[in-house]
Each structure stands twice: as structure tokens, then as C-alpha cells.
Amino acid sequence: MDSPVSKTDASKEKFVASRPSTADSKTMRGCGLANLAWVGVDKVELRQRLMMPEYLRLAMRDCIKRKDSSAIPDHLLLPGGAVADMAPHAPMVVFINPNSGGRHGPVLKERLQQLMSEEQVFDLTEVKPHEFVRYGLGCLEKVAAEGDECAKECRARLRIMVAGGDGTVGWVLGCLGELNKDGKSQIPPVGVIPLGTGNDLSRSFGWGGSFPFAWRSAVKRTLHRASMGPVARLDSWKILVSMPSGEVVDPPYSLKPAEENELDQGLDAGIDAPPLAKAYEGVFYNYLSIGMDAQVAYGFHHLRNTKPYLAQGPISNKIIYSSFGCSQGWFCTPCVNDPGLRGLRNIMKIHIKKVNCSQWEEIAVPKNVRSIVALNLHSYGSGSHPWGNLKPDYLEKRGFVEAHCDDGLIEIFGFKQGWHASFVMAELISAKHIAQAAAVRFELRGGDWRDAFLQMDGEPWKQPMSTEYSTFVEIKKVPYQSLMINNE
């Protein structure tokens, strides 16, 4: 039987699959961005291109320290405002997670401060992204409102780089998303210096999967590319977990108690909904998964948090991770157990909404699928493409469209067990395709299972289940899109 995956050149297919669909992501191809790795970048010219005038840098620094966007000393305000040509071509700030990237974190911070300025590099252990958005950008906007053309241009041209992993990038994107809620139209685009483990957000927008060995020269090239790279769009997805009265034990950072239970009433859940429900909400940019993969991740994270001395490097991490997979039956289910009994169809129902459709539609949970993933990006699990690059005739047959990270659709697929997942991640076969959807609702009901395991962008948690009432996990697109700098 023919594979649904296209058999054209693999390297070419990976490149196409990871490219956002926006037209402006293609406009810089002729500008030589792909060859910038071989072009020397002058340090002085780069500094002039990125560094904001001193009076603006100091004003923003003071406002952030005082947590007051109006605390601008008079001596830092230029009489009559500044002329527009004082604004740099691409004013930039960098957020760095010093705990990422091993020993590179602190020295990278120092290198960035040398290339730009100390005031434009923010240590995330000292300045949080929401503080910069509220007080730093707020300061810039207040100075611009006083007639300062330089401040106005800096605010309009501002770009942000994040040195960290996917979790750090998502943190910054989430804080910038608050500008949309406040009705702000100028949202700074974000680029990535990959310091994490998976770095799937970084891979998806051309910033690579790891920090380069020759990092000193690479930092200059990266900042130069970020100053001129095209802007692409990225969907983000809101998750709402509605459960019987109780609490999630040790919820991840990205999952917060919801003020209101805003479960979509378009699908009648009255029979199975508890009289008093507890709700949690969060936002993800890459994926949400339910099942054995999340259970293995939860066990590994719990061990790493309680016994960090056992997980001190990538090799030991992989050994421990694999042992968890085997001990919990992900790779080797005990013979006394029927693998089908561990299938998610025993505890789960799935409903989806298709594009431009207000009605929920129930879809079947495939037999023996033990992990289900709702994926936004093409890159998953450190650069794999589990959805695959599907042939046009297969797309038409299944009613799918080519997947992009800005198309308002999320891809849903399943893994049967660890070996199946391993072959999928090696791109030898495709995952079990289930659906493409504009909204998803998972309904979980415990039987012999007391808990389900979920993870969102790499953060796992244990989700208690009831045998009497259902737990609902609803995914909907966030109304606004994030802006990313595309290093194509």
C-alpha cells in the first residue's frame, strides 16, 4: 500500500514543511539571508544598527526598576523631542535565561551586552517579560507621546530575541500577547537563540536546534539576521481543563486556575458535567499530548526534580527516560496485560470543530492508540515531523489541507506504543492521522484508570479523573497571532 508521505528529497521536504505559509516569509529569499553565515559582520556597524540612544535606554531601565512607566527623570527627556534619524535601523532587546545552555548562559549574556548595550539585555532571573512589557515598553510609549520621534520610531521598529528553550520563548510570547488584549497594534516580533533541549520553536523558524560550537561569531551573525529577517505569524492555542471539584496536583507553570469555566456550550455536556467544576487554563504554541508519552515525561520530570543528581547530562537523561518508558509499558507492555486495555479509546471521546463550522463532530479514537498529540508546529520532539509531508491525493482523500503553523488548524495524531513512536520520530513511517481541526474537545472518564497524564509544550502533569463525571479538555485558537522573526 502506498505511503501517504511524499517520497521526494527528504532534506527539501523538511525545509518546506518547517516554513511558515505567510507570503512575507518568502520575500527575503533574494536578499542573501541564507548566505549570511559566510559573511563577516562588523561589530561597530552591528552596534549602530541595534543600539537605542542612551537617554531612552536609561529611561526604560529606570522605569523597570521602579515598576512605574511614568517614572522618567526630566534630565533624560530631550527638549522638543529627538529627530527620527537618531533611531537605529532595528532597535533590539534580548531576554536570556541564564539557566539554559549549560555553561554558556552567563558568558553569552556578557557577549550580548558587549555587542548591544547592558540596558538592552535582560536576565530573566532579574527582569520578567511582563515587567518589560508593562514598564519598559510603557516608558517608550509615554516618551513617544510627548512628541519624541526617536522614541516613536524605536517603538515601531523594536525586535526581540530570546536566548533560551521553547518554554522561555513561550513565556515571552505570552507576555507580548497581553499587548493585543490592551488594543496595541505594534507587537514586536520575536527571534530565538536556541539554548533549550528540544528547541522546536527555534527549528520551525530557521534558528536551528542547538547553540553552535563557534558561538562568539555566531551571535553576531544571529543578531544581524534578526535585524533584517522577515516576519512570520504563529498560531497559539488556549486550553481549558474543566474537571469535577478538586485540584490538579502539582500543575505546570503554564496551567493556571481559570476565573470562569468558559466551556463551549455548543456541545451538550450537561449529562456528564459535574454540578461544581474546577477549571484551569493555559496557552501552548507547539503541542498538547495525552497518554503514555506524557506519563513517561511526568515520571522523568518528577525524578529530575526530586533527585537532580541522577539527571546531569543528555546521555544520563536519555537512559533514565528510556527506563521509564520500559517500566511503565510504553515500549514493552507486560504479557499479562492486553495492549488494547491501555488504549485511550477506553477513557476518551474526541469532538472537533472544522473550519467555518459551528457544530461539534465526534470522531473515533483509533484502536490501540496509547498517546494522542494535538500539534501546531511541524517540528516535534527535537526536530521530527510526525504529521509527515503528505501527498496531495492523500490530503484530498482524508479531507486534510497542507499543514502550516499559521493556518488556524491543529493536527491530531496518535502513537500506538513506544516502538511505533520511535519509527515515527525517525520519519520511517507516519503517525496515525486522526483529524485536522479548528477546535478540539477531549472528554476523559475514569474506569480502572484513576489518573490521566497530559503534557503541554514539554510540561507534564497528572490529571485526576472521576468515574462519575467527565473531565473536559478543550482547545481553541487564541484570537490573535504571535509574530516571529523568520531566519529563512
Swiss-Prot record:
Pfam families reported in the protein's UniProt record: DAGK_acc (PF00609), DAGK_cat (PF00781)
Oligomeric form and interacting partners: Monomer.
Molecular-function GO term, any one: ATP binding
Identification of the protein by name: Diacylglycerol kinase 3
Keyword annotations of the record: ATP-binding, Kinase, Nucleotide-binding, Plant defense, Stress response, Transferase
Region entry Disordered, spans: 1-24
Protein role: Phosphorylates the second messenger diacylglycerol (DAG) to generate phosphatidic acid (PA), another important signaling molecule. PA is required for plant development and responses to abiotic stress and pathogen attack. May be involved in the accumulation of PA during cold stress.
Similarity field: Belongs to the eukaryotic diacylglycerol kinase family.
Keyword Transferase: yes
Reactions the enzyme catalyzes: a 1,2-diacyl-sn-glycerol + ATP = a 1,2-diacyl-sn-glycero-3-phosphate + ADP + H(+)
Domain DAGKc: 87-245
GO BP field: defense response; phospholipase C-activating G protein-coupled receptor signaling pathway
The keyword Nucleotide-binding appears for this protein: yes
One cellular component (GO) term of this entry: plasmodesma
E.C. no: 2.7.1.107
